[in-house]
Amino acid sequence: MRILRGSPALSEFRVNKLLELCREQDLPVTGIYAEFMHFADLTSELDAEALEKLEKLLTYGPTIEEHEPQGLLLLVTPRPGTISPWSSKATDIAQNCGLNAVKRLERGTAYYVESSSELSSVQIDIVKSIIHDRMMEAVFGDLEAAAALFSVAQPAPMTQVDILSGGRLALEEANVSLGLALAEDEIDYLVENFTKLGRNPNDIELMMFAQANSEHCRHKIFNADWTIDGVEQPKSLFKMIKNTFETTPDHVLSAYKDNAAVMTGSKVGRFFPDPETRQYNYHHEDAHILMKVETHNHPTAISPWPGASTGSGGEIRDEGATGIGGKPKAGLVGFTTSNLRIPGFEQPWETDFGKPGRIVNALDIMLEGPLGGAAFNNEFGRPNLLGYFRTYEEKVTSHAGEEVRGYHKPIMIAGGMGNIRDEHVQKKEIPVGASLIVLGGPAMNIGLGGGAASSMASGQSAEDLDFASVQRENPEMERRCQEVIDRCWQLGDNNPIAFIHDVGAGGISNALPELVNDGERGGKFQLRDVPNDEPGMSPLEIWCNESQERYVLAVAPENMAAFDAICKRERAPYAVVGVATEERHLTLEDAHFDNTPIDMPMDILLGKPPKMHREATTLKVDSPAMTRDGIELNEAVDRVLRLPTVAEKTFLITIGDRTVTGLVARDQMVGPWQVPVANCAVTAASYDTYHGEAMSMGERTPVALLDFGASARLAVGESLTNIAATDIGDIKRIKLSANWMSPAGHPGEDAGLYEAVKAVGEELCPALGLTIPVGKDSMSMKTKWNENGEEKEVTSPLSLIITAFARVEDVRKTITPQLRTDKGETSLVLVDLGNGKNRLGATALAQVYKQLGDKPADVDNAEQLKGFFDAMQALVRQDKLLAYHDKGDGGLLVTLAEMAFAGHCGVNANIAALGDDVLAALFNEELGAVVQVKNDELDSVLSTLAANGLEACSHVIGAIDASDNFVIRSGDAVILERSRTDLRVIWAETTHKMQALRDNPACADQEFEAKKDNSDPGLNVSLSFDVNEDIAAPYIAKGAKPKMAILREQGVNSHVEMAAAFDRAGFEATDIHMSDILTGQAVLDEYHGLVACGGFSYGDVLGAGEGWAKSVLFNAQAREQFQAFFNRENTFSLGVCNGCQMLSNLKELIPGADLWPRFVRNESERFEARFSLVEVQKSDSVFFDGMAGSRMPIAVSHGEGRVEVRDAQHLAAIEASGTVAVRFVDNLGNPTQQYPNNPNGSPNAITGLTTKDGRVTIMMPHPERVFRTVANSWAPEGWGENGAWMRMFQNARKNLG
């Protein structure tokens, strides 16, 4: 092992945060210095040249002042026996740079801790707990101890459970020691079947059976027979869900049988490269819509970042593994936790009810979990466009009397939608003799028993088993696998995939048997052919671990050569681990021990283990009505706006890329002030169409504490009111995912679950014409622990999360909550689907006063709800609505406030028509919406509402103005008069506190201050050219198409939209992978232009873009090609985002680029996804010809975009050279250092540069993602199909003549 010192690991504010944590623990720590340490496991010693190359590779990141280390050394590394995602990617880079002697690289952080007095062992343990995550990391006292990272253990043998002589008792003991979570009747089933086989089961067979038959995988409760209050029920829960499909099968192509459901989409031109020529073009075909929503609650409670990250990753794999290959497109993520209790910002309704030591508190879940979910989506290259966040934790009187209800076991929901070809929707038959393949990363000893562990209430499994069930994420590997799947489905009828499943709970022990069973085959497998990075694992560990980023496939022998070539090009590892057999039998051979760990008929594993029967009793709630004593209106408003469920969610949104693909038509951020209040997410189906897809969410979980059925109905209803202002048409076009979370077995909850499923499956959905073709359940939503001898528990309410998916006719027609002050005289109309009942039970108002109340909102009339949807569809289609916002958490007060925030305007509302009870009128959470309409169209709108049965519940409640006043009257009496800006700031406090805790607090403070500025004009546009003129048209008309190399490296994810932009400008865009260049399959001298695209090459390890650049610099053949291209005078090049970082590291090869800076970690130390205003500078860049002085917004999505110069002279030289091409400006048009207008903190607001001759341009923002007007989060009226940034690409075409 060779040890190589790295750069300092912590910025000043990160050090200060650690010191603050030490002070809070009364530790005498006076200083902390940290630097990265690299450990290289070598097959042979490196010569001087190789060592120098390795040292250069390991020099990366921002320049931070180095210190000579002093103090106590604590070395934090990944846990020995695990391989970090950093290690896999850094090792890839080293090997792609020709360092073949590097077997593996790993990284640790050496902390040097100084203290005013010597630390005791107890104090050292506290410091260790502050600097490392015990779930994923270890701490050593010296550098050499890191050798443990590379120690290779001998393979461990399997063990047998002796039931032949030990009987049932032997299996009962194994059930506990292995954490199998087998039910009593399953133990009987296994004893009986292995006795019949005449042999003892191996541990691996038992674990495999436990995973395949866990509640998590088999959904036993949803398939059970039920007796409620002594009466046998006619249907299982699942049958009631399936009833929605039986009643409304319209538009559903696949339901209940695959990894995701599929519904009919639109016929569009799907844009992708031709499999033979690799030239991008449009393929006119059906782009059907696939949809899936998963939960990952247990892992997120244990270790939030990897828990949420692998939750998103697993759901993405479900979409890719649908049919015989799908394409994930847009994501969502949601969280429900107990109260945050932010230090120094504790709220009056937040009581500390305690928690067990093995799970993380709600605050840490929300500081870490969302980052994990966002990071996976970002790195994979999927925009995250939707979500929700709710907190609930209270002692209430519910069905089981007085008890603490809350979410110590959180809900972490990950979902999304994608597209799939018509001919790929159904899986094929697996041919006998087919190769059975594992595609993706290697097996590692992680995530063991995750399926069974998540099926238990938190606290029932031993802590080290919880520890074992945590997973690791490597999204860049998953991206490579998805690229393989993409290449396969793009072959159309020649797709080599016959069958595909993702690897999830239970690992390949679940996935491979499921694969062959669903394909009506058996399988013969070789254990030692499974790719394995930890040779010391036992057969059980190799077979059952839940290493992520893996898929299992069946490929016919004659298609293996094509499949192999695709995998090699994409650098996606795979292995043939078995062969499909005619006989339905499962065999697993172990060549190392020369034995057969598994040898069983498929029907024992996946046959009919005993069906569950559940008996339940209905319990009634006796909760007192809400008391109003001491509730003062102004204080109530402030409390509700601070409740995390209602409060601004920016801290959850700007961490997630919302523009990748260039197909996003509606993200969370609305209008010129980019306020996060969108009702739903909308994507375009392709670049040549306005057809698209929409998704929205609905959940009202606290209501279940009063009325199970009402909670379920409201979830469905809210998903509809959220999506109603998009252009969908027939309500039957909407399909729902239902995710059910329940503390099964808790008094009253089983009967309540049955009531809720019946309410939507048998009643509401059939009445509305809605189908639920997909969903998931998590039946162990309870946390138990012992605190000082006292048994404690926190039980979640029954929680139904509904996600609605729909095909959209015209994405341009989507209406947002932004109130419009530029449309003349307008009115606000409330449609109240509660019909004046104004029920306050389980509302935000009740919660912030520590109450529950008695009667909650409900859907009393399905026909009226459908009438509401139909009315909104008619008004959307006729362009009659200026703004639309549904009424939900916080009631009408919050709906109006959020609309005012988005419109930056005043509101004058009168609620006299809503009854005398002001609190009930303002804070009830009955379904409904507020719309803004022009006064000259008001009668027409009201008549449309009346025609749909809504006349009695539609009320004109006010108007808007350009002021800062938020005024609510009842008749002539003013009941609330506030400054909109003040309310906006209160609404923002929660997000500010969370950002300040998690990110650079100086940046968080600047963003918070900016929200106090009422004079902010918002985003605006000033162009030096006509956006609707196509200056490339004359050149395109000539028919010549210059060749454009669309360059990508493993992990790059923005290449398709880049190709689409150049294609539109008249180029022949060709897909080129770096592996094509390194293997000589592609030669750059055939091309006129080259673009290095954005994404996460090598997952940004070794510096963003640096690993990619070094794989060029350290490879003689690649270096020569790039240098020759840059020196050819009739070429041009562009680098965007990751490509910008990469080209800046190649500046030694690029003429006139010698002054270019480096791009390093953002000042906020956070991935920043913003829609930022920039100004094009006067420069010689061929891309910006005629654009100087233009000011327009652009997509920003990066974690390492801050310009780093050597010193002030370097910066002055850059400015003097005239090579600055783009700068960030504030909304007044001035270059700015203020965050978030300058999202990365670059000096002089520089974010784009060019060479002295203008042929090579680099920029951090993404013009290719907003080349269409519809892809801009906000655009001024008057722009046609092309957005302003299309001019860049047209300039490139004009430049070549």
UniProtKB/Swiss-Prot annotation:
Disulfide bridge map: none
- Lineage: superkingdom: Bacteria
Q: What is the lineage of its organism?
A: Bacteria, Pseudomonadati, Pseudomonadota, Gammaproteobacteria, Vibrionales
* EC number(s) recorded for this UniProt protein: 6.3.5.3
Catalysis performed (reactions): N(2)-formyl-N(1)-(5-phospho-beta-D-ribosyl)glycinamide + L-glutamine + ATP + H2O = 2-formamido-N(1)-(5-O-phospho-beta-D-ribosyl)acetamidine + L-glutamate + ADP + phosphate + H(+)
Pathway(s) the chain acts in: Purine metabolism; IMP biosynthesis via de novo pathway; 5-amino-1-(5-phospho-D-ribosyl)imidazole from N(2)-formyl-N(1)-(5-phospho-D-ribosyl)glycinamide: step 1/2
Q: Which residues bind Mg(2+)?
A: E718, N722, D886
Enzyme active site: C1137, H1262, E1264
| Record SMART domains | GATase_5
Task: Please name the NCBIfam families in this protein's record.
Answer: FGAM_synt, PRK05297.1
Protein name, entry field: Phosphoribosylformylglycinamidine synthase
**Which terms in the Gene Ontology molecular function aspect does this entry carry?**
ATP binding; metal ion binding; phosphoribosylformylglycinamidine synthase activity
* Membrane-spanning residues: none
| Residues reported in the UniProt entry to bind ATP | G307, A308, S309, T310, G311, S312, G313, G314, E315, I316, R317, D318, A678
* Record-annotated Glutamine amidotransferase type-1 domain positions: 1044-1297
* UniProt family annotation: In the N-terminal section; belongs to the FGAMS family.
Signal sequence residues: none
Self-association and partners: Monomer.
Q: Which GO terms describe its biological process?
A: 'de novo' IMP biosynthetic process
Q: Name one GO cellular component term.
A: cytoplasm
| Name of encoding gene | purL
Report the subcellular localization.
Cytoplasm
InterPro entries associated with the record: Class_I_gatase-like, FGAR-AT_N, FGAR-AT_PurM_N-like, PurL_large, PurL_linker, PurM-like_C_dom, PurM-like_C_sf, PurM-like_N_sf
Q: Which UniProt keywords apply?
A: ATP-binding, Cytoplasm, Glutamine amidotransferase, Ligase, Magnesium, Metal-binding, Nucleotide-binding, Purine biosynthesis
Task performed by this protein: Phosphoribosylformylglycinamidine synthase involved in the purines biosynthetic pathway. Catalyzes the ATP-dependent conversion of formylglycinamide ribonucleotide (FGAR) and glutamine to yield formylglycinamidine ribonucleotide (FGAM) and glutamate.
